[in-house]
Amino acid sequence: MTVNTSIETNPVLKLTFDFALDIITYCETLDKSGKYVISKQLLKSGTSIGANANEAQDAESKADFIHKFKISSKEIKETKYWLKLCQHSKEYPDTNALLNRLLEIEKVVNKIIASSKKNHL
């Protein structure tokens, strides 16, 4: 089951790829101020969202497709946790823009999961 894997023409891949680039930039800022532990966790979860969405494009079945997006959904939740932790900690860069973009991605991913489940039954 192969679908559109082009970042330029697949909206969810574009959203998650651009978000991953912004997460990398944010984490580099954290690294410069010595906040390595949070940076490492956030970098892993924040870039994994798009990696799993990309993997879903070559899923072996509809069930596998749904599963990959469920993993993306879990990574979204983890990323949200780390960003909110930064938001409420002292001397961390602002996370509001990232949290807003993450909410947009979360809505898209949840819609993909819901519609795929509906069409799968």
Whereabouts are the PLM-identified features?
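Short, C-terminally biased terminal segments at protein or domain edges
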Residues: 1-51, 55-121
